[in-house]
């Protein structure tokens, strides 16, 4: 089942964050350091208290996946329409649980949550080379919104 993460989940989430880091490190070792996480325990505990940054976990007796989200709103902008967006900052399914629909359950829960709080859309970023993630998001109905380009000097 999917639920909002609590402080009890911090250790399991940290382990999943290590898996995410290694996926990114393998794809882009020039950008991502190996064997680290983007949050430590204290930062993660603090993040769990921020209502604008909900974190959800898939839990079947143990945490098998997570979704880090960020809710943003644009209002009264000169150029942009008023829009409320749920950005998926990070989604991970434990290596041991892949292919068991954990990712689908997490994504659908986040989608339903976004609808329930009045979001107009869901966005996320996928690193070039992360083909399994790209395929998964396309299967969930997501489409390319924009493309970021780079040249390595």
Locations of regions flagged by a protein language model:
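A short beta-loop-alpha structural element at the N-terminal edge
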Residues: 1-15, 24
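Conserved GNAT-fold acetyl-CoA-binding loop/helix
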Residues: 22-44
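A short helix-loop-beta-strand connector motif used in the catalytic cores of GNAT acetyltransferases and
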Residues: 42-57, 87
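Conserved beta-strand in the GNAT
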Residues: 57, 62-71, 87, 92
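Conserved acetyl-CoA-binding loop-helix of GNAT-fold acetyltransferases
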Residues: 90-93, 99-112, 139
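Conserved active-site alpha-helix within GNAT-family acetyltransferase domains
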Residues: 104, 108, 116, 128-146
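Conserved GNAT acetyl-CoA-binding A-motif
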Residues: 114-125
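Conserved beta-strand-loop-alpha-helix junction that forms the acyl-donor binding cleft
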Residues: 123-133, 150-153
